[in-house]
Amino acid sequence: MSIFEDTAPRAVRHEPLRVAVLGASGSVGMQTLDVCRHFPQKVQVVALAVRSSAEFAVKAANEFNCKYVAFADASVKGNVLLDALPQDCKASFGPEAVQALAVLDEVDCVVNAVVGEAGIYAGLAAVKAGKVLAYANKESIVVGGDLLMPLVKPGQLIPVDSEHSAIFQCLIGENPADIQRIWLTCSGGPFFGYSREQLKHVSADDALAHPTWKMGAKITIDCATLMNKGLELIEAHHLFDTPMDKLEVLVHRQSRIHSMVEFVDGSVKAQLGASDMRLPIQFALSYPHRWPAIAKPVEWQETAPLTGDYADEKTFGCLALARHAGTVGGTLPCIMNAANEVANHAFRRGRCSFLDIEHIVAETMNASEVQRVEDLQQLTLVDAEARALARSFVG
């Protein structure tokens, strides 16, 4: 099912919009709070969740006068810093506490910025509870798309990834049957134009130097391998109910075109703007309306010529692996995602090389049995088995 089964935007919304920000201390979470900071009359941060940062949570809870704070790491309980939470703010602990925020009666919209597979549970809980889900947790769709998407009602799920937000905006008012191709753009990462021989020698510090976007470490490495773009292909496949062979990747070094949709009549709609994650976050919170810009607008007369190149799936094999996983479907995307998280982490810790990431993921995929997706418990088991297998390939 596509999120564009019905293109009519939701007409009724609570104002101020009552928001729960999950993964609030991460890159997307902090930028979400910054958007909320600029629109205090339109957005109320009711709840926030972090992994373990008591200092950050206390500061944010006081700034936004939050009623609820959750810590995924239960060991934070008893931290003396929590004494400084607002008097009427309730703190809770453990993974279940994060999920509980997604179903609060006082919450209209859940911003799911939790990194990794853990965000699936909160995303499913939010959708089942009828909340609007502004999601930046691509793993929710890549791993659990077969479970999540049949539950999503039109207008309920708004993508926060810049590429999928762009596609979403291009498709408003359009008939999904008229889509010829969807083009997801990417900067090419820090190693655009490198050969396989050159990639043998790059370090984690090299890979973390993204040319355009300010993001967390895990996703920045994924951008360097182009696995991030591969995950986004699978996302688009689920979100817009589009076959994998109608999804293309365009390397666009200027990062001004965030994605494009080509229609059967040959026309193309593109969404352009500044390279600022606050733009898609703001759109997700304001939809179906638009709020005044807080990001610096693009000075088009000063912009370099806009260029595009096909992505090199032979040099950057993770992109080809993701396309294969999305085409096969079933539990293979879950297996791929789990192996990638293990390999990504190992690379950042100096335990494997850059090209080893691709090899670890490929070996794990090849050694795993692909099943039809049945339920979340099955995916949890598949994820755990794939991680254990991937760790064995790290050595």
Label every model-predicted segment:
Residues M1-G395:
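Catalytic, metal-anchored helix/loop core of enzyme active sites in primary metabolism
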